[in-house]
């Protein structure tokens, strides 16, 4: 009888079962970025919604049934009604992130057809919008150059295969063709006009309100950094096009679940009524003096340690938005005994303790923009522990 060898199952170790997603102290220059989990809620907001989350997570819920009529309904109905009131739009669709909005729109509405888009608006950053559009099955007709595109460029690109005029938010673009002009051109030729606002700052509502006032075919944006919510992509626009997207087979693969819908509902409610509960609102409305006071407090906590400590002006950055550099301060430290502990080693040891910083000119820098009082105390304790072991 032949020997049958069985593959051994690797042992389950405590480290394997430990939650990989640990709290960090973000003293880096970037706030709400992909590396650090993007958006997060304020403690007071979480306390308010915790009972609702508990209900959703520990009980069956009426996700797709109307408790008044006993009929099946769409899971988005409650949220759609709130979005329509807040934004005065015809129709709304929600998918799992903003990349999905772009892919779904291109795949469902421009399959094997041409999307005319400015070359300059597709470049920059880690997110390659061009690849997403090409993967959708649509064809791209690029116009203009790296930082300029005129209305005449779009007009000259029109042909029998044209289906959509696409615009995406790119603050670095120097010569921008207004969406209003693109929309007029699209209407003239019976094309879809679509504006991808991406991570536009919706705490200043003007950007979205101006676009929606034009009654575009479609507009999309990211929910988490736009009004500090769960990660999701929001599509708004004319009912004809949104209904086509909703009925497309791909939508089912991209739709959001009950937890995201619950978080979105309460986030939008707070965005409308209680902006002081929104983390991004609080951070963006910090005064220069308040930031300096945080830097001075951290300086005072670190000064007694075996460190060279100083305060410097700096900038913090919201997500991947190039136009969102915000004036701030940082506390710079350097071990006095660099033979035992240089900056690179200190940076790594801090990282391993969940304190994320940056290195600049042989100094480890603590950006104070997104730090709170508890974070400052924790940083001092972690540094003291590291220095004692050096």
UniProtKB/Swiss-Prot annotation:
Pathway: Aminoacyl-tRNA biosynthesis; selenocysteinyl-tRNA(Sec) biosynthesis; selenocysteinyl-tRNA(Sec) from L-seryl-tRNA(Sec) (bacterial route): step 1/1. The keyword Transferase applies. Its cofactor is pyridoxal 5'-phosphate. Pfam families: SelA. This is L-seryl-tRNA(Sec) selenium transferase. GO terms for molecular function: L-seryl-tRNA(Sec) selenium transferase activity. It comes from the Bacteria. It comes from Helicobacter pylori (strain J99 / ATCC 700824). SUPFAM superfamilies: PLP-dependent transferases. Signal peptide: none annotated. The keyword Cytoplasm applies. Keywords: Cytoplasm, Protein biosynthesis, Pyridoxal phosphate, Selenium, Transferase. It is found in: Cytoplasm.
């Amino acid at each position: 009888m032949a020997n049958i060898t069985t593959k051994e199952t690797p042992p389950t170790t405590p480290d394997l079962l430990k939650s990989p997603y640990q709290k960090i102290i973000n003293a880096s220059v970037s706030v709400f970025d992909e590396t650090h989990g993007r958006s997060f809620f304020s403690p007071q907001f979480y306390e308010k919604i915790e009972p609702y989350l508990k209900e959703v997570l520990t009980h069956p819920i009426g996700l797709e049934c109307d408790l008044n009529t006993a009929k099946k309904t769409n899971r988005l109905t409650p949220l759609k009604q709130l979005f329509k009131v807040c934004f005065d739009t015809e129709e709304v669709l929600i998918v799992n992130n903003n990349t999905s909005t772009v892919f779904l729109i291109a795949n469902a509405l421009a399959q094997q057809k041409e999307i005319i888009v400015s070359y300059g608006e597709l470049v920059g950053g880690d997110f390659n919008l061009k690849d997403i559009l090409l993967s959708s099955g649509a064809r791209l007709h690029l116009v203009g150059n790296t930082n300029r595109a005129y209305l005449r460029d779009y007009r000259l690109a029109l042909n029998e295969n044209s289906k959509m005029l696409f615009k995406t938010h790119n603050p670095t673009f120097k010569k921008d063709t207004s969406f209003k002009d693109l929309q007029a051109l699209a209407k003239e030729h019976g094309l879809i006009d679509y504006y991808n606002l991406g991570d536009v700052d919706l705490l200043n509502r003007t950007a979205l309100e101006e676009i929606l006032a034009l009654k575009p075919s479609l507009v999309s944006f990211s929910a988490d950094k736009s009004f500090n919510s769960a990660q999701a992509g929001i599509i708004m626009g004319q009912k004809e096009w949104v209904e086509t997207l909703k009925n497309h087979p791909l939508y089912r693969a991209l739709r959001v679940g009950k937890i995201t819908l619950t978080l979105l509902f309460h986030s939008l409610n707070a965005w409308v009524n209680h902006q002081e509960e929104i983390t991004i609102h609080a951070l963006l409305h910090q005064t220069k003096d308040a930031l300096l006071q945080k830097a001075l407090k951290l300086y005072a906590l670190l000064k007694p340690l075996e460190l060279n400590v100083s305060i410097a002006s700096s900038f913090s950055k919201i997500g991947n938005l190039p136009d969102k550099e915000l004036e701030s301060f940082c506390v710079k430290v350097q071990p006095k005994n660099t033979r035992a502990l240089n900056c690179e080693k200190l940076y790594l040891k801090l990282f391993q303790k969940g304190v994320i910083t940056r290195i600049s000119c042989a100094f480890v820098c603590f950006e104070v923009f997104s730090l709170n009082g508890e974070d400052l105390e924790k940083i001092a304790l972690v540094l003291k522990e590291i220095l004692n072991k050096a």
